Amino acid sequence: MEEKKALIIVDVQKAFDDKKWGERNNVKAEENISKILELWREKGWTVIYIQHTSDKPHSLFHPKNEGFAIKEIVKPMDEEVIITKTVNSSFIGTNLEEFLKLNEITTVVITGLTTPHCVSTTTRMSGNLGFDTYLISDATAAFGMRDQNDTYYDAATIHNISLATLHDEFATILTTDQLINDFIKTH
């Protein structure tokens, strides 16, 4: 029997277009997610959207603010699942794990924003919960950040270090092309 798969699209929301986040890497991440999404839908495999929400009225992620909306380039279809979350992990305080298990999904492919935060936390938990987890390196992105000593790390460095901490221990890291050629087209 073929293993059931789910594509998880984490927090691809308009809030991340705000200039407050600063410099970003992988400007084509959403384009790559869209490519994967199109092929995933053709296969009839499960698509799950994760949408971050905040109860703080001034937050970009508050449901009344435009930033809460999922970006048009990866717009969900009516029958696709949207799970809202309030913390970094897509598994905490949501029914994601239950949904995956009820639908006998054992393999998950994770994409979305941002690599060091919600994508990383979701990937770690997915791996810890025993799912066969894949993270798509060019279908995620990071912003530059400062550490506790005010040292600045550019977006590419943050992204690459985040991927390095996940590689092999929590997930298999693939590019969009690798996923399409070695995973989607062979299943």
Swiss-Prot record:
It holds the Pfam family Isochorismatase. Its EC number is 3.-.-.-. This is Uncharacterized isochorismatase family protein YrdC. It is an enzyme of class 3 (hydrolase). One of its GO terms (molecular function) is hydrolase activity. Keywords: Hydrolase. It comes from the Bacteria. The gene is yrdC. InterPro entries: Isochorismatase-like_dom, Isochorismatase-like_hydrls, Isochorismatase-like_sf. Belongs to the isochorismatase family. It comes from Bacillus subtilis (strain 168).
